[in-house]
């Protein structure tokens, strides 16, 4: 072999510089979605995988916060420079005008938030192009590929921006249930509920990015304005318009003793309402994240079950719900809510924001509760630390819910059919 006459693959390799593996196209997540192989449960696993990936990335703490703000808002502003409204129909033109006005207003209003998130380490070297076509399901795990390499400004972004692209892609494909499942599980895994302040901005931005890409493919961009509007671009414009024009969100409280099925039901409500969820079982442990201290039940009145710690947990849940509601997301607070004063915090919160407050009262006979707690302790497959002692304390120390508390109360039995429960909540009870 010579430089002028190289031969490839003629001899056994001595060492690989780069060894690539060809993947089956059916492994792409867009194909999995089309084939019905991407559902709620593995979307939760996908979200947890992405959250884990984001948490391993070193934050960028040495850049100018003003530059980070500009990096967040400039692409969103520029989207509208690359679209000529005249090539779209009248309705799409009106939507574009509304979206642009909203984007400019939000870019200004959120500038302090973008700066604060940059200072807190939310800006990291992310994937940058995280949508379904750039994700694989291989050998039971999720594998991202084709990350952005050519432009550092497109990959050094807020982790909320990274996940927003995938959530928007699911919305665009008509799967709002999976989109909210993804966002909800991502938030529960990393605890970054503050990201909800900017999440809608990034969802709209990512939708407009895809509108620009679709327009360019159809010859609709400013550079080549000839051609009629392509449905793809208008579809993304419609999605962005829907994200901008959100109805008043609702606050849903799960209520009941440990083992009554609150989390089981809220797992189904997240994609069904749809809504985002905060769980007391996760939030009470959040301060210990990364300390290496193994989670364990410390007993009634001790550790995380001290009265002041319980108040702190409910306060954290309320803060997260406030952030989500103010950002236009339906929120579910999954906790026992056995004390009237804790319920009142959330009723007052909803009232202050003009939101409805619903309480879903999950009930079960005491023997069923005790059996579930026993089986949970044996399997150890639940985030709850509640044991028999905690349950017995709850059964003797609770404030019954009354109509005077100002909530819409729905009582649910432990043996209710899950599909019927969801239909009752969403349709007859008119939550959605």
Residue ranges, per PLM feature:
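A glycine- and Lys/Arg-enriched "phosphate-lid" helix/loop adjacent to the NTP-binding pocket
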Residues: 289, 296-308, 351-401
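ATP-dependent phospho-/nucleotidyl transfer catalytic cores
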Residues: 5-132, 136-250
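Conserved substrate/cofactor phosphate-moiety recognition/catalytic segment
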Residues: 270-329
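The conserved Walker
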Residues: 257-258
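Conserved lysine of the Walker
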Residues: 262
């Amino acid at each position: 072999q010579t430089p002028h006459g190289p031969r490839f693959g003629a001899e056994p390799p001595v060492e690989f510089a780069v060894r690539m593996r060809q993947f089956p196209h059916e492994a792409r997540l867009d194909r999995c979605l089309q084939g019905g192989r991407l559902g709620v449960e593995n979307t939760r696993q996908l979200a947890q995988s992405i959250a884990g990936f984001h948490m391993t990335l070193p934050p960028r703490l040495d850049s100018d916060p003003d530059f980070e703000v500009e990096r967040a808002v400039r692409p969103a502003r520029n989207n509208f420079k690359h679209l000529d409204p005249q090539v779209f129909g009248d309705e799409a033109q009106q939507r574009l005008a509304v979206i642009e006005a909203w984007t400019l207003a939000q870019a200004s209003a959120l500038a302090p938030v973008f700066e604060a998130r940059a200072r807190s380490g939310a800006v990291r070297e992310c994937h940058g192009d995280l949508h379904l076509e750039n994700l694989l399901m291989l050998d039971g795990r999720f594998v991202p590929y084709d990350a952005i390499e050519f432009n550092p400004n497109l990959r050094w972004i807020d982790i909320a921006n990274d996940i927003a692209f995938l959530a928007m892609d699911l919305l665009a494909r008509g799967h709002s249930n999976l989109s909210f499942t993804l966002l909800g599980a991502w938030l529960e895994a990393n605890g970054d509920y503050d990201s909800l302040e900017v999440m809608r901005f990034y969802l709209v931005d990512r939708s407009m990015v895809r509108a620009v890409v679709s327009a360019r493919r159809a010859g609709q961009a400013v550079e080549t304005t000839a051609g009629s509007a392509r449905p793809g671009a208008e579809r993304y414009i419609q999605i962005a318009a829907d994200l901008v024009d959100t109805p008043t969100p609702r606050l849903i409280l799960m209520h009941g003793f440990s083992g009554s099925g609150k989390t089981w039901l809220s797992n189904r409500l997240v994609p069904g309402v749809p809504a985002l969820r905060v769980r007391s079982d996760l939030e009470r442990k959040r301060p210990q994240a990364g300390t290496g201290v193994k989670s364990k039940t410390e007993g009634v009145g001790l550790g995380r079950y001290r009265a002041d710690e319980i108040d702190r947990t409910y306060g954290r849940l309320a803060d997260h719900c406030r952030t989500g509601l103010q950002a236009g997301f339906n929120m579910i607070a999954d906790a026992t809510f056995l004390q009237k004063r804790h319920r009142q915090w959330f009723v007052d919160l909803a009232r202050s924001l003009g939101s409805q407050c619903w309480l879903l009262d999950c009930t079960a006979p005491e023997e069923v509760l005790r059996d579930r707690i026993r089986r949970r302790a044996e399997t150890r497959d639940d985030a709850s630390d509640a044991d028999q002692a905690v349950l017995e304390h709850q059964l003797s120390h609770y404030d019954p819910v009354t109509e005077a508390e100002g909530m819409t109360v729905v009582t649910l039995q432990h043996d209710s059919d899950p599909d019927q429960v969801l239909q009752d909540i969403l349709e007859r009870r008119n939550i959605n």
